Structures are given as C-alpha cells and as structure tokens.
Amino acid sequence: MFEYSRRIQFYETDLMRIVHHSNYLRFFEEARVAWAVQRQLIDWRDPHSAAAFAVLGTEVRHLLPCRFGDTIKIQVQARLTGVRVVFEYKMWKKKQLVSEGRTEHVNLGPDLKLQRPTPELKQCMEKEQWNETWLLNL
C-alpha cells in the first residue's frame, strides 16, 4: 500500500479554521503523483509526463475536519480496468479516518485522443494489490 504524508498549511484552511473542501482533491492528486513518480510512470524533470492522465471523475467523502498544522497520511490503491485507471484514497489524521476518495483517469496523447495504457503502466498495475471493499463510505 502506497502512503504519502504532508502537513496542512494555513492557506489551505477557511474561515471556519478547517481545511477547505476543495483541497482534498488536491491532496489526493499530490498522493497520486507521488505514487506515479515512485513507480517511474511520471518523470519530475518532464512536466508533460504527468499530463497524460486525464481526469474522468472524482468522488470525495469528508468524514472529519483537518486543521492547520495537522499531519495527514494518504493511502493509495490503483487498478487498471480496460483503458481506465481507478485510484482510491484514504486520508488519515493520526489514527482517525478523515476522508475517502476515488478518481478515474484515462491516458491521452498530445492530440488529446484516447490512448491505450502503455506497456509500462500495464506492467506496473499487474503488481498493484486491490481490495474491492477498501472504501467504506463511498
């Protein structure tokens, strides 16, 4: 299971002093990019390498608030279904589950046309473990 940690910054909070809801998808994206970099599917030196994964859909369930200074841990699981890549996320603050999410992506070429998954992506996904009942709240 891939894990990504980060600390909540002040600018990510709102007038209620909690993380604004729009930031959860950003946190999930950070975790997804870190996952892909670790697996050498994205190259930090080539920003265009990350552009291939177009977002088809997103879902987020907010369970508990996060605040400035909290350290969060995001767990990521991924699978390939045909031409779609599905990512699921669990965000934790200490031992409390604060959010769950799912994003769905497809691979696009420079002309923005749908492409089949690359051999590298297929090989990577064959190694990934997937738990069908992992998300409890979506």
Predicted feature residues:
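Terminal targeting signals and extreme-terminal segments of soluble enzymes
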Residues: 1-73, 79-138
